[in-house]
Every structure is written in C-alpha cells, then in structure tokens.
C-alpha cells in the first residue's frame, strides 16, 4: 500500500436541535400548560488511534466528515434524539493540527486513544423551560447552537527508538536490512529510499528496539532540494539518532563536509531535533584496510570537533554491527521513554459555554419580571412565538 503521511480533512460536528413551542391539549384539562420539549445535542467528531493502520491514504480521497444533527424537540415534553457521533480512525503516531489556528490538538500515540476534534452544538430549550409564576403560557424557545467546524491537518509520524541519518547512499537501508527483517530497496544510485521504513532489531527473546530509515538528505534540503526535509518529522520521537557517514565516498566528496551538511539541515528543520542524542557511525570500512579506516575516521571526527565515542562498521559485511546494536540497546534500556502527559481534551469549544441555558433562562426571567403587570390572557392561543438566539 502506498505510504501517505499527510492529509487534510474537514470535520463538522452536528448542530443542536431546536426547542419546541407546544401546549398540552387534553379533554377535561382546560389549562394544560406548556409541554414543548428540548432539542437534542449535535453529534461530536472523534479521532481514534488504530495500530492496524499504517498510512493516511484513505483520507486523500475521503476528506469530509460530518456528525449527525440533533433532532428538534416535540410536544408532550419529548426531547429530541442526540445526533450520532463520527469516529475517524488514524494510525498510531498521527498528529492532529488545526489549520485555522496552527494549534496542535493532540498526538495519537497509543492504540485506542481518542481525541475530540469537533464538539456538537448545544440543544435548544422548549417552552416548558420558560414557564414561571408570571408567565404561565410561554411562547419562547431557543434554537440549538451550530456544531464546531474545523479544517485539520493529519501528520503521521513513525514511532521508533532509533532514527537513521545520512547522505544518499551512506548505507542506511543496507544497515536496516542487516539488523532487522525489513527489506528496503538497496541500489547504487542516490535516493533509492523514497519513503520511510521501520525495522525491528531483536537482540534476544526479551530485548528489541525499532529503527527508522528515512530518505537521505542533501545540501539545500530545507529549501526543497532532493526529497526535502519533510521526512525528518519521523525522527522527532526517536530517542537516539545514528548519523551514518560513508568513510570513503565513491563520488569523491568530502566526508567532513557531508556530515556538516546533515547537521546544518537538522538545525534548519528543528532545534529540538538537532539537540537529540546523535551517534557518529562510519560505514563501509570494508573498502579500506583496518589501520587506514581507523586513521581516516579519527581525522574526520577531529575535523567535526567530535569528542564522544564513534563507531566503525560495515553494514554489508556485518563488521562492527552487532557491537553497535548492543550499545544502542543498552542506551535505550538506561534511558526509558518519559511518558508525556496525555493532552487534556478541551471541555469547551470556543463558541460553546457551559452556562448557555442558564443565561437564556435568566434573560427570560428578567423580561418577565419587567412585564409582570402587563395585560395578558392565559387562553390566548394566537400569540407570537418568540425565538431567542445567542
């Protein structure tokens, strides 16, 4: 299936149902009084994370999701039925962004996690709600409020422990093939990898980690050169980055300059990503003899001002790969993921307020108090129906 990691959709919650103006008419009950029921609340729109999905391709074709409107109230104090909710299932790792405000509404990081993205409208009040000691035959009601409407950007971000960085043809895909069962395409030309891929590295029956391979970066990627830097977002949740450097590039480029290009593009994309733990890994040492490879790696590290440990491996032959993987496993065990607090669901939507109905009733009561001595007829059935809007 085609890998799609971005999609824009429209979500519209249901409007609230209107209240009803009605009076009880029954034999032998001359003054039945008001019996208009309230409307039903509008349906909500929810996001739900599903671990069985791995792409957003479905939302390239289906872009609009609308919840059901609440039914209007009816006579005999019948309340309208609440509108049905709509649930949109997305892959685990999806970030939901409100395109109107640029606000991140939530990150779907766990299977079954739900996120409210559009709140349904409040129900309107029937005329029964407006009955008082001075207004026995109210002809007032309120309409339901509109449901929330948002344009959302969905961004799928892979969940991995380790991320691979490097220029095209640095050997990232060869490495992930060597340490996991993943089989990304490998060839001797740049940009063989076009989409991110995941591989599970199993060290033993109880220890494993997930590694993410993304397309290579080149100079100017931040400005859109090559495949750009859009895939770097898949590394944001990684705990450590493996920066693969081709120790002896076949195209004759300078490994030091290549490494600096990667660092520069990281900083242009995100300072947070640039400050993540990053390990220097020199690949393709099988092309040189051992002493020459060690001397060249040391010279490159010094030129980069690298003072931490670095690794020499050959992904093709497996030389040094196992030791690197065990060190990564140890790092992951010693640095467990700090569970971020789940984003709190907003209890209100901007145009909603919890005391909406209370305010409506207070306003009607004030008007009734002002007009308490006006002439009015309880049996007048031809009066005007009042609709209060907010």
From Swiss-Prot:
Induction (free text): Constitutively expressed, levels decrease toward stationary phase (at protein level). Induced in a dose-dependent manner by UV irradiation.
Pfam short name (any one): GTP1_OBG
Effect of residue 173 to N: No effect on persister cell formation upon overexpression
InterPro entries found in the cross-reference section: G_OBG, GTP-bd, GTP-bd_Obg/CgtA, GTP1-OBG_CS, GTP1_OBG_dom, GTP1_OBG_dom_sf, OBG_GTPase, P-loop_NTPase
Phenotype when changing residue 163 to V: Increased sensitivity to HU upon overexpression, supports normal growth, no effect in mazEF/relBE or tonB deletions
Function description: An essential GTPase which binds GTP, GDP and possibly (p)ppGpp with moderate affinity, with high nucleotide exchange rates and a fairly low GTP hydrolysis rate. Plays a role in control of the cell cycle, stress response, ribosome biogenesis and in those bacteria that undergo differentiation, in morphogenesis control.
Similarity comment text for this entry: Belongs to the TRAFAC class OBG-HflX-like GTPase superfamily. OBG GTPase family.
UniProt-recorded name of the protein: GTPase ObgE/CgtA
